[in-house]
């Protein structure tokens, strides 16, 4: 079974989308093995988005992700990384397929409701940033 890191970003939490997104995850058959609502510190945000540090939008990205609570989720299931990314849809909601989370709920590329790891390496790194091993179900 593959594990991945998923996040409901501040815009999704603020708009009350957490129950709907969790329902979609469970309906798809993924197992939630870790879940916490939290505020992300600037330090954690900068570590999480380290690959974007040199990009012009880095500061705005860190400001946004620290602007309110997020829901950090550890998912487990067959092809969880690709499956969760397919459920989210394209980063730009205008390009997201109908029925995806971003097509249904995102307003802009910057405030696009969800995050998901893009590779096994990213999933392992991001899960370790947001969860201790003893916080995850076996």
UniProtKB/Swiss-Prot annotation:
InterPro entries: NDK-like_dom, NDK-like_dom_sf, Nucleoside_diP_kinase, Nucleoside_diP_kinase_AS. The keyword Ribonucleoprotein does not apply. It is found in: Cytoplasm. Coiled coil: none annotated. It holds the Pfam family NDK. Keywords: ATP-binding, Cytoplasm, Kinase, Magnesium, Metal-binding, Nucleotide metabolism, Nucleotide-binding, Phosphoprotein, Transferase. One of its GO terms (biological process) is CTP biosynthetic process. Its cofactor is Mg(2+). Its EC number is 2.7.4.6. The active site is at residue 115. Belongs to the NDK family. Homotetramer. This is Nucleoside diphosphate kinase.
């Amino acid at each position: 079974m593959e594990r991945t890191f998923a996040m409901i970003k501040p815009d999704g939490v603020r708009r009350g989308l957490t129950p709907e997104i969790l329902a979609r995850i469970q309906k798809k058959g993924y197992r939630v093995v870790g879940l916490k609502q939290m505020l992300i510190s600037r330090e954690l945000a900068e570590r999480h988005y380290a690959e974007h540090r040199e990009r012009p939008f880095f500061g705005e990205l860190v400001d946004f992700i620290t602007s309110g609570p997020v829901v950090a989720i550890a998912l487990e299931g067959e092809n969880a990384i690709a499956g969760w990314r397919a459920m989210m849809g394209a980063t730009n909601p205008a390009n997201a397929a109908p029925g995806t989370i971003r097509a249904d709920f995102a307003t802009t590329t910057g405030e696009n409701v969800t995050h998901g790891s893009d590779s096994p390496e990213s999933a392992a790194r991001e899960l370790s940033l947001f969860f201790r091993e003893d916080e995850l179900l076996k």
